[in-house]
Amino acid sequence: MKPLERAMKTLTLIMGLFLLAMIAQSSYAQQSPQPPTETIKTAASHTPEQQEVINLSNIKWDWMADKKVDSLETLFDDEAMFTHMGGTWGKTQELATIKSGGIWYKKAAVYAVDARIFGNTALLLEDIDLQAAVGEHEVTNPFMVTEVYIKENGKWMLTQLTFSHLLRPVKMNSNKN
């Protein structure tokens, strides 16, 4: 076999192996599962304590939409932390942001809620679409909201509120108010 023929066969073999590897990789990529679009379901029934926290959370969304910072001030623990897409801050800054309209929580559409009670701690997960005005821009985003409440002296206090952006599309019909 001449050197040129040997080089051509080697090159053909390498190209064939490369093509086979590309096909295998493409096939694997097409079989990869898509990320989940919904991770929680609302239970058919809740304990009275779970329902109390769910109701409190719903009232909180109304207070935020109506900018009722006096009501929110009594709900938020003094050491509470709020995690948004743009950063994390405490109670004072959250209330100031709501009062000034820096973030106006116009409407929260809650699609699913999971409430769990651990002693005097309540963990709430909510699958929501949030319509908000951020500065001069109105936006609607899908979030998984995590809320943590602590019961002190018979009263639930919000200690943590975190917005985690979801990959699913927005479900809310947005008719700008």
Annotate each predicted stretch with a short phrase.
Residues 21, 29-30:
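A cross-taxon signal for low-complexity, glycine/charged-rich
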Residues 12-24:
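Bacterial N-terminal signal peptides
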Residues 2-15:
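Bacterial N-terminal signal peptides that target proteins for export
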Residues 9, 23-26, 117, 124:
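Short stretches within intrinsically disordered, low-complexity N-terminal or propeptide regions
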